[in-house]
């Protein structure tokens, strides 16, 4: 379990899953590929839900449940618990969202639905790359990246809830709010009840959580938002233990499974003039939009608020890592383009943009290590996860 909990191995699992998916999709003949794709996305288990929806809607809701727990912790007692702590990561996160959107819309204005795709940062992948290659960097770089990624996730949650919600059913939303409220009440009672009564409360919480997910799924809002609502309502005392318990399943099963399904596309053989502008918009948004947005907004914020929370070089490293959209960007791409010819090109753009951003970050971290090679040994405060 300790290996699966490791940020290093989490990034490796994700990368291997995406690579295997692309290889699998492109070695099959077209007829077999079409049959596999139809089975995953069109076959309804018991006439209720497709295998794709189980992963993209149900299992990813568990991931966003853990994200919400971490977000709540950071807002209450962590790196975002005060204005002075949150302002620099907040400004950087804003730049890392606004600039990629601007680049995307300037390149692909004919396909405006894809503007959210380059705004995401994959917290698991980016922290994994930092853990593998950034051992010589100060530990505050990881803290800054985590705060930035948490705010980025918050923005992603808002985008998913607003930009990708269709045919809203307010009746189901009311049911979802009631069940989430009951979940929060049960969580509150669980934190204060005697051990002998937990066998009644825990099943009630699970039933409320399942009912909340079904309600959100039926409401027209993306079902992952159910995970966010439940994570926010969970009692903070239980949050850390539950997040720790879920971590190996999220890192070892949920995220790799989604990465495999989302990246399972056939690489189209298109001439340069037939490539969709959405591909260029997503690719440039992730690679250059994140780099420029986070670094430039960060420099302005550091100067304006006269803070020294992170050096310019380390800010560049974080900016490059911010361009690793991967899992969340793949989800955004599905929501924006699934069922259209642009979808496959969007997946390729996310994968290439994330890979190039990771390579750029690795080069910067290697440069930092080279600059520090003459430093005295035994210095503390390094990234070591």
From Swiss-Prot:
It is found in: Cell membrane. The keyword Cell membrane applies. Pfam families: Na_H_antiport_1. GO terms for biological process: regulation of pH. It is a multi-pass membrane protein. The chain crosses the membrane at residues 9-29, 45-65, 87-107, 114-134, 155-175, 198-218, 220-235, 245-265, 282-302, 312-332, 345-365. One of its GO terms (cellular component) is plasma membrane. One of its GO terms (molecular function) is sodium:proton antiporter activity. Keywords: Antiport, Cell membrane, Ion transport, Membrane, Sodium, Sodium transport, Transmembrane, Transmembrane helix, Transport. Disulfide bonds: none annotated. The keyword Transmembrane applies. It catalyses: Na(+)(in) + 2 H(+)(out) = Na(+)(out) + 2 H(+)(in). HAMAP family: NhaA. Na(+)/H(+) antiporter that extrudes sodium in exchange for external protons. Belongs to the NhaA Na(+)/H(+) (TC 2.A.33) antiporter family. This is Na(+)/H(+) antiporter NhaA. The lineage of its organism: Bacteria, Bacillati, Actinomycetota, Actinomycetes, Micrococcales.
């Amino acid at each position: 379990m300790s290996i699966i909990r490791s940020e290093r191995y989490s990034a490796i699992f994700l990368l291997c899953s995406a690579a295997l998916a692309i290889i699998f999709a492109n070695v099959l003949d077209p007829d077999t590929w079409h049959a596999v794709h139809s089975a995953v996305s069109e076959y309804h288990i018991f006439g209720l839900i497709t295998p794709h929806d189980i992963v993209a809607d149900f299992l990813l809701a568990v991931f966003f449940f853990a994200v919400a727990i971490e977000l709540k912790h950071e807002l209450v007692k962590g790196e975002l618990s005060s204005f002075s702590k949150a302002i620099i990561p907040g400004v950087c996160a804003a730049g890392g969202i606004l600039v990629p959107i601007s680049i995307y819309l300037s390149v692909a204005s004919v396909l405006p639905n894809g503007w959210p795709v380059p705004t995401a940062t994959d917290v698991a992948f980016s922290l994994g790359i930092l853990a593998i290659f950034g051992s010589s960097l100060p530990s505050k770089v990881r803290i800054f990246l985590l705060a930035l990624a948490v705010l980025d996730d918050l923005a992603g949650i808002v985008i998913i809830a607003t930009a990708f919600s269709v045919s809203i059913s307010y009746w189901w939303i009311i049911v979802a709010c009631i069940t989430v409220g009951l979940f929060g009440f049960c969580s509150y009672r669980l934190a204060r009840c005697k051990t002998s009564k937990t066998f009644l409360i825990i099943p009630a919480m699970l039933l409320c959580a399942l009912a909340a997910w079904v309600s959100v799924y039926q409401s027209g809002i993306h079902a992952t938002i159910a995970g966010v609502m439940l994570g926010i309502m969970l009692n903070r005392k239980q949050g850390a233990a539950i997040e720790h318990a879920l971590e190996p399943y999220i890192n070892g099963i949920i995220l790799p499974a989604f990465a495999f399904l989302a990246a399972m596309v056939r690489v189209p053989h298109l001439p340069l003039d037939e490539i969709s502008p959405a591909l260029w918009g997503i690719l440039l948004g992730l690679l250059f939009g994140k780099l420029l947005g986070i670094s430039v907004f960060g420099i302005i914020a550091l100067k304006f608020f006269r803070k020294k929370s992170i050096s310019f070089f380390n800010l560049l490293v974080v900016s490059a890592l911010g361009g690793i959209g991967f899992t969340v960007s793949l989800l955004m791409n599905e929501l924006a383009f699934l069922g259209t010819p642009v979808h496959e090109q969007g997946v390729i753009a996310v994968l290439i943009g994330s890979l190039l951003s990771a390579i750029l970050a690795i080069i910067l971290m290697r440069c930092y290590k080279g600059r520090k090679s003459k430093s005295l040994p035994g210095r503390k405060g390094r990234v070591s996860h």
